[in-house]
From Swiss-Prot:
Organism annotation: Sinorhizobium fredii (strain NBRC 101917 / NGR234)
Taxonomic lineage: Bacteria, Pseudomonadati, Pseudomonadota, Alphaproteobacteria, Hyphomicrobiales
Lipid-conjugated positions (S-diacylglycerol cysteine): 17
Protein name: Probable conjugal transfer protein TrbH
The entry's keywords: Cell membrane, Conjugation, Lipoprotein, Membrane, Palmitate, Plasmid, Signal
Entry's family note: To A.tumefaciens Ti plasmid TrbH.
Length: 148
C-alpha cells in the first residue's frame, strides 16, 4: 500500500513538469523599416558596433546583398564610420593587417516595436526601437553578447 501511495505522489509531481503541446511561442515577425526610421536605426546600431569591434582602418565588413531600405542605410552608416563594406561576396585582395568580418542583421516587429540585431562571429548587438514617421528612438538599452 505504501509503494502504491509513493507511486501516485511521484506521478503527480512529474506530471507538473510536462510542457504544453504547442511549446514556446513568440510574437516576433519580420518587418519592413523604411525611410527615416531605417536611417536612424542603422546609424545608431552602426555606431554601437563601431564602439565594440574596433577601428575601421583594420577591418572590412562583409554583409549579404539586400534591397531593403535598412540594408542600404546600414551599408551607408558603416561606410560613414570609415569601414570598407563588401556586399557582392567578392572581397578581393585584403591586406595582411586587415581583418574580414562577416556581419548578419535582422529587423523584427515585436509588440509594436522594432527589434534590430547585428551579429558577427565575436559579438551580437540588439536593441528595441519605437519607429515614428520622423525616425526612430531607442526603446531599450543596448544588449551586447560577446562570444569567445
Amino acid at each position: 500500500m505504501r509503494k502504491l501511495l509513493i507511486s501516485f505522489v511521484t506521478v503527480a509531481i512529474l506530471s507538473g513538469c510536462q510542457t504544453a503541446e504547442d511549446g514556446l511561442t513568440t510574437s516576433s515577425t519580420p518587418t519592413t523599416v523604411t525611410g527615416p526610421a531605417a536611417s536612424a536605426i542603422a546609424g545608431d546600431m552602426a555606431s554601437r558596433l563601431a564602439e565594440q569591434i574596433g577601428p575601421s582602418a583594420t577591418m572590412t565588413i562583409k554583409i549579404e546583398k539586400d534591397s531593403s531600405d535598412f540594408a542600404s542605410a546600414l551599408e551607408a552608416a558603416l561606410k560613414g564610420w570609415g569601414y570598407t563594406v563588401v556586399t557582392d561576396g567578392k572581397v578581393g585582395r585584403v591586406g595582411k593587417d586587415v581583418k574580414l568580418v562577416e556581419l548578419g542583421y535582422s529587423i523584427d516587429g515585436v509588440d509594436g516595436q522594432v527589434l534590430a540585431r547585428l551579429s558577427t562571429p565575436s559579438i551580437a548587438l540588439g536593441r528595441a526601437y519605437t519607429a515614428t514617421a520622423a525616425g526612430a528612438v531607442p526603446a531599450s538599452p543596448l544588449s551586447i553578447m560577446q562570444r569567445n
